């Protein structure tokens, strides 16, 4: 029986009713799984949640390439490439390139005559990302992988080929417009953050590198979660937002199953991500919580305003002082050092001209006025970006499922 004649009944809860002329076929009838290794000289490819299959060096990627490139799999244009561990996040796509990908990916050669661009949009649409999550198995979110047997049965939604091409043309054009708008707004956010940084540098930068060492103004704390009776929230530290509850910035569960060894921080404590301190990853805890045992938890002496101190430590001059003191393998430049960390002892050797409490309060007030204005603009811009991204995802879903006739709106 020709696989081109194989169709399946529509009983798929995550897809809308079929449009006239549209069909469903199982993935196994359209693709053949192939594992073609031992091609170390081919270019490296990777699958990104936001970009699909692209050259690995075209995007920032924290995953290290294995020394033995012979274990990587060769794929060709039109092949379906799936990151089995991250399919539920959207790390799936039809490759437009020839190259090699991780040996842990699932690679399928095409055995069909459908439009590759349409299939790429389809496989990366919200309904299909939802389907990958349904077909993934594991201990918990963040540690799952797609079930191979279930994946082979994935129903593929197929309009006539001429409609596929029209959908691909429409989405190429419309998403490019949205992406341009999003990029403009992202550049605006970057510019606003630079203005924010410049305001802090202007107000406090000159106080760095003179007067007394920081050790006279800070106390390091090391209280562990298993030493306190409270059930405290997990906190995270970022370069952009400082210290926040982890559940406010990511839906992923904690990587560590046992958090009993995590450090306790109290509201107003200074928390430093020691691996990213030289990039400004520090801030004041907005509430009691627990943080990674690798973080440093510090408390300012009573005569030092914690908000003033955190602002001073995020100035460009102070961050540069920290960068000079990191210890790790490699260079601190652009975060290239492997396992870079700053020791609290080295941190406390940095000099800081701490004024009297009244002057601290005045400087904090001036900075806060500027920060509040800029932060409002950043929030408004980021909300606009989020709405544009939601619009983009909804447009893709509507097009690939036939909820809009792209030939009428083209």
Predicted region positions:
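Acidic, low-complexity, intrinsically disordered peripheral segments
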Residues: 241, 399-410
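Extracellular/lumenal glycan-associated surfaces
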Residues: 172-174, 390-403
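Non-catalytic DNA-recognition/assembly elements of restriction-modification systems
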Residues: 2-39, 153, 157, 161-165, ...
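A short beta-sheet element
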Residues: 73, 77, 81-128, 147, ...
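A short glycine-rich beta-alpha junction/loop motif
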Residues: 6-13, 85, 99-106, 139-165, ...
